[in-house]
């Protein structure tokens, strides 16, 4: 496992196969199931905590839509994951899918990839079976631990994800990096939960040195996702 700022978090190498390697199986394909109507829906992904799916009012089956997977922070749930971009989804025409971690936070935070990868896979499979997807705008993002997990899964699956959005991440702990997704990182200079000097200010130059196209923005606040940064990230994703 390639580690960027992960040593201090106790990340260990994962197994070579399936979810333990952080690899996703789902791929965009022909629609085979009836899509949900516009609005917010719970989706069963095989765990005790459902995912949340938001279908924008502007969705048209004959026009492929951008899709963004959104991951919550520690102690959160699917609603916390989807909320930062929810207000902008209709105008942007983006489908949002937000799974929940199996435990209080995402598995790689505890040392290795595991069942949470399968939860993301099942959430994506649900979307791919029901909606026409724009494969040039397929993103994964998150806040705090969710941002770290989005970076970790996104870089491990850069042949699937075109964009990764990380709001106040702590680290990236990808498996074997595949592809070169574009990356957006924002972080508050007054963050006391994941101090910026120990996280994003170290992480973003290392990602650039590894060859990634990184947009990096700091803002005058703490461990939050300001609405203007959420909108900025979505505009970047859609251009």
Regions found by a protein language model. Name each.
Residues 184-186, 192-239:
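C-terminal catalytic histidine-bearing segment of alpha/beta-hydrolase fold enzymes
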Residues 81, 128-130, 136-180:
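Primarily recognizes the serine-hydrolase "nucleophile elbow" in alpha/beta-hydrolase
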Residues 79-86, 123, 167-176, 197, ...:
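Alpha-helical scaffolding within the catalytic cores
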Residues 66, 94, 162, 181-182:
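Alpha/beta-hydrolase fold active-site loops
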Residues 34-58, 62-132:
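Serine-hydrolase catalytic machinery in alpha/beta-hydrolase-like enzymes
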Residues 9-67, 112, 145, 153, ...:
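A domain-start/cap signature at the N-terminus of enzymes
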